[in-house]
UniProtKB/Swiss-Prot annotation:
Cofactor: pyridoxal 5'-phosphate
Molecular function as annotated in GO: histidinol-phosphate transaminase activity; pyridoxal phosphate binding
Enzyme Commission number, as recorded: 2.6.1.9
Protein name from the UniProt record: Histidinol-phosphate aminotransferase 1
Length: 350
């Protein structure tokens, strides 16, 4: 802490990202990256963009990518917002739409960036407890609020809220913005983007870091009513008019166009997830139902922190949270078959 820091900065509690180890020999199953590489079409598009044009600023509106997203989801271009990763998109949403008089609602076990944004932007909030099965209770959100946000599937649990339940939340709060954070939706869920034309208070966010294997590019998006998108554009252009670089724009657009590769790799992750679940259950683990590219598991006879340490000694990194209610769980990303086997072998006999 420095004497030059403002009182505001001194009171911030920043987000702690997952470990990015420098050792390349480790089996990295802690940050939910896709084990399969980006679309070859995306790589080719970025390679073609490595030319003299890099001396020029990128399109501030990222229209090429915006139209690719709009075409993919069957919406209009003015219903799409783009940012430098979904975290930046979420930051603009908190800043531009969720600073209200009434408290923002989100699950008590959820994406840990939400309370960080609330602290950054001075947003009053309430953490709504999940039920004993770590599911969202829809009725708990049917009360006065200044907005609602939740991941679907939830993170770090991986549990999915059905689309009709999402719609119940929307109907119960027609005067509040409801944000559905769909970072992992492509691994087993149905996107709420199909509802945006019926609910002007709905905003759906997604990322290209997970199902499209572009975590290194930092591309995120939101889809919603044009009025909501306009608010985000106003915030963006008061902060950074050029959030996406030229390589990110063309690479992400090509990734959306390569539907065959996308479908194939998503299915590979889903199939691998079911294999890992079966292997862990055979070792006595309790595994929550997952619609994501990770699983959330605990062993009734073994401490989670101890298991994480044991795996690390075997060269396998998983994520352990010390948060109340989930301190005995491990979040395990789905890797390649070789990585998944290393996980199971690393656990040994329990």
């Amino acid at each position: 802490m420095s004497k030059f820091w403002s009182p505001f900065v001194k009171n911030l509690v920043p987000y702690v990202p997952g470990e990015q180890p420098k050792l390349t020999k480790l089996v990295k199953l802690n940050t939910n990256e896709n084990p399969y590489g980006p679309s070859p079409r995306a790589l080719a598009a970025m390679q073609a963009e490595l030319n003299d044009n890099l001396r020029l600023y990128p399109d501030p509106n990222s229209d090429l990518l915006k139209q690719a997203v709009a075409s993919y989801y069957g919406v209009q271009g003015n219903q799409v917002f783009l940012g430098n990763g979904s975290d930046e998109v979420l930051a603009h949403i908190f800043h531009g739409l969720l600073q209200q008089e009434k408290p923002l609602l989100f699950p008590d076990i959820s994406y840990s960036f939400y309370p960080v944004y609330c602290g950054l932007y001075g947003i009053e909030h309430e953490a709504v407890p999940l039920d004993e099965q770590f599911q969202i209770r829809v009725a708990d959100y049917a009360r006065p609020n200044g907005g609602i946000i939740f991941p679907n599937p939830n993170a770090p649990t991986g549990c999915l809220l059905a689309l009709d339940a999402v719609e119940q939340i929307l109907k119960a709060s027609p005067d509040s913005v409801v944000v559905v954070d769909e970072a992992y939706i492509d691994f087993g869920g149905q996107t709420a983007i199909s509802l945006v034309d019926r609910y002007p208070n709905l905003l759906v966010t997604q990322t290209l870091s997970k199902s499209r294997s572009l975590a290194g590019l930092r591309v995120g998006l939101a889809v919603g009513h044009p009025d909501l998108i306009e608010a985000l554009e106003r915030v963006k252009n008061s902060f950074n008019s050029y959030p996406l670089d030229r390589l990110a724009i063309v690479g992400a657009a090509a990734a959306f166009e390569d539907r065959e590769y996308f479908a194939k790799t998503c299915q590979q992750v889903i199939d691998s997830r079911e294999w890992v679940v079966a292997q862990l259950q055979a070792k006595g683990f309790e595994v929550l139902p997952s619609a994501a590219n990770f699983i959330f598991a605990r062993h009734p006879r073994h401490d989670a922190a101890g298991l994480a340490a044991k795996l690390r000694e075997q060269g396998v990194i998983v994520r352990h949270f010390k948060q109340q209610r989930i301190a005995q769980f491990l979040r395990i990303s789905i890797g390649t078959q070789e990585q998944n086997q290393a996980l199971i072998d690393g656990l040994g006999e329990l």
